[in-house]
Amino acid sequence: MAESEYVFPAPERFIVGTVGLPGDRSFYLQAKDADRVVTAAVEKEQVELLGERINELLDMVRSRSADGYMIPAGPDPADADNANLEMPVDPEFRVGTMSLGWDTRRRHLEIECSAISFGQDDEDSQSPVLRVVLSAEAAREFARRADQVVNAGRADCPFCSLPLDPGGHLCPRANGVPR
């Protein structure tokens, strides 16, 4: 039976990445420490929201503390992690819900990603959960990369804002004229 709880109290890496071409990409969260790599499949919208909420939470905590908990205002370019996902990309589960929290005493961000639940009432079965603890610096870098990965997809049509395929698309604002 697969592990049901993946805990990373101090991961070497916690990143988001994709596999596939723009328009047909699959998104993944990946946590790595010295002993293991855990990958979870996630939706593009979840990645976008997670990055935004991390920055919002860190900004809020920073503004409410006299020393700002020494939270950086933005990511440090020296911390940039633009390397690919660890291969092979074999997701343990698909993320359904995510939660964020700030531990004031330890001064770190906690992220919890739970698998999609299909309403099974079996008390013996436990949905997989990925728990990751990040420093404020690592969280800012994750949010930066999340934004970069999300925006690396297809360009938007200047008329209708729908994504453009490499061969163009039938634009609804132009009455179906190819763009």
Each model region followed by its residue ranges:
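N-terminal auxiliary interaction/assembly segments of multi-subunit proteins
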Residues: 59-63, 70-74, 144, 151
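Short cysteine/histidine-rich zinc-coordinating motifs and their immediately flanking basic loops
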Residues: 168-175
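Short microdomains enriched in Cys/His and/or Lys/Arg
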Residues: 177-179
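Non-transmembrane "mature" sequence context
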Residues: 85-87, 159-161, 173
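Mixed-charge, glycine-accented linear interaction segment located at domain edges/termini
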Residues: 40, 116-168
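The feature marks the first
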Residues: 1-52, 56-60, 64
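Short, structured motif recognition centered on aromatic/hydrophobic residues
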Residues: 25-30, 50, 54, 109-113, ...
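Intrinsic, low-complexity N-terminal interaction/targeting segments
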Residues: 1-21, 27, 68, 72-129
